[in-house]
């Protein structure tokens, strides 16, 4: 398969939209009509719950598949429901890709040695099964990883990405309020921890730079810290950057585009709750109106990001 960075860059350009929609389902987000339909299909509550999640996700995907280039399911919201939840995740990935969307699995995995190899093969590559063949188990186009175990925890993901045309996004400067507890600490050489991680990501991604000029070894840099995002981009000129923190976490479009390159490329901004629950911000709308509201919000987000790129506040 082609280089992941090239595929994502082309998809963003084709839709003129640097947005990835997060798929982090909760039962409270799902319309009653969907839950009732799922309950009518299955007697097993666990199975009907997973079916409701899948129906909801399909509705969200149908609403925006011609607008956004990618979706980002957060694994925890499916693991929460055990085996049935993981089946819903698998079906969500397959459905999104059937609609022409790239899938970034937000799993934040990492370990060392054989465990890292197993994660990499299971999430991004192929796994050998009993008949001797190798098959793709998860099928995601990319996965988020935690690079704070160092190179030996990342190397298996890089190798699989090189072989399979998949990609990774390493945590560099996260969007959560307490991120600075560790990531802003200063090292003996004067760099902050997140800066050192950015330098490592730049090093790890050198062999996976595609024709687009971007590497399939990307980074996660939150929109909630725009000044650090500008600094991170300087240290990672070739990295694709996944930008959480827009919308429900408080960051606006100006901060969200801080990590983009000078020509407005190289980053993709995530929105989860603000898209999934867009009906909440529209007067007179209910959960039953989620598809139309999500589509409206996705178009509005696209236009705001593009306007912010045309008039940069953080450079």
Where are these regions (language model features)?
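C-terminal helical cap(s) of enzyme catalytic domains, especially alpha/beta-barrels
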Residues: 256-262, 277-315
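N-terminal glycine-rich anion-binding loop in soluble enzyme alpha/beta folds
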Residues: 2-65, 285
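Conserved anion-binding
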Residues: 111-217
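Conserved, mostly hydrophobic/aromatic
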Residues: 21, 71, 106, 143, ...
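N-terminal active-site wall of soluble small-molecule enzyme domains
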Residues: 67-69, 73-132, 136, 225-228
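A C-terminal functional module that forms or caps the active site or interfaces directly
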Residues: 54, 219, 223-270, 274-278
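Acidic (Asp/Glu)-rich catalytic clusters
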Residues: 61-68, 95-98, 158-163, 233-236, ...
